Amino acid sequence: MNDTLSQYPDIASADPGTRRVYAKVLWRLMPFLMLAFIVNAIDRINLSFAKLRMAEDILLSDAAYGIGAGIFYLGYILFEVPSNLYMQRVGARRTITRIMLLWGMVTVATAFVTTANQLIAARFLLGMAEAGFFPGIILYMTYWLPASLRGRVTAGLLMAGMMAGIICGPLSGVIMTHLDGWLGFKDWQMLFILTGAPTILLGIFGWFWLTDRPEQSNWLTAEEKRQIAQDICSEPGAVGSHFGGVLREPRMYIAGLVYFCIYSGSNTVTYWIPTLIRGFGLEDLKLIGMLAALPFIVAVCAMYLLGRSSDRHMERRWHLGLTMIVGAGSFALLGLAQGNVVLSIFLMSLGSAAALSAIPLFWTIPPALLNKAGAAGGIAVISSLGNLAGVLSQAAVGSIKSATGSLYLAFDVMALVMVLGALVLLIWIPAHALKDRRDSKA
């Protein structure tokens, strides 16, 4: 962990005692939080695999599935702010425990839906339950870590969510292949039960493991608590601004539109890849699960390489724009590759990895685009616009699939959306508008 800390200049130059303090904090908090991010993502993605079997049992059309996949984000958007306000009142430990227990119970309860409308209601409740989890964790980190550590710690948490995509496919395939009929439950029911129950257990564990703030911990010494308090209190505070001023900032909405386009593509990957793979003529659930992990494996590698290149060259726009265009081109070519399973899998993996990799690339832009006073409010609005894409894009994909019987047209539409986002980025967010260019690095 000390080697990891050497990546952060402010910490690397600190005395060994300070380095030991933050190594201790990271070893205490990060394993739990990364595991929480993994189960969080799995409990979202599992629906895409359950659909392969549950559609016949509950008469779930592709249009209804698209609504169910998207309405999750509506519940999330509506209850995100109240959840964050609640966290400020009662503390992180109670809030994170409450969120994990509720989303775990809703996931398990989804195993017992018998109609499409019940599934849609369950997904809305899941969005309500999860609301505030990601921003709550980000806020929690500000209590424990100085700014020089929080950036890459956040990236590590996002990478943990990506690892869930690698885990969920093979895990779902094994559960649905070997546990059909176990304890009287069908394969898709066992999937929801066995992916939701660990979340409940982890939430209970979090109640005893997490501490709201450093000064309340019994695993830090008095000197270590003093060091953390001193480091965090010495950081310059953000300049205040009225939220109304943030809402009048055009660049925020331009960035929000770009994120909307990116999120439309990445969400389509998350919820429709297993269905797309089965459309290649493959029916074995274990094989589908293994192939569904490929885009996430490629995405993890691409995220690292693209992020490193973007940081080295201090260039954001073309890295992101070209990544989006590669994803869009791969999606558009899928229809032409019908009948060629190997080429279809290659295009699916490349396009999906590009769509997923675009997300961390995008989040290097808002902090550089917005002024310090408006960054916090602007980023929140941009995030909400992205979540709105989760609602609309999946309803659109489901409707197209129901109307045409094919996913290829839906992926063509998502390709056009991603090209639109790339053009908006490159035309309306000029390089000189970003504050972290190479010439400002010196």
Features from the language model and the residues they span:
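Glycine-rich segments within core transmembrane alpha-helices of 12-TM secondary carriers
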Residues: 152-176, 198-199, 383-393
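Extracytoplasmic gate region of multi-pass secondary transporters
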Residues: 47-48, 248-307, 359, 363, ...
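C-terminal transmembrane helical hairpin of 12-TM major facilitator-type secondary transporters
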Residues: 316-365
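Helix-to-loop junctions at the C-terminal end of transmembrane segments
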Residues: 79-91, 302-315
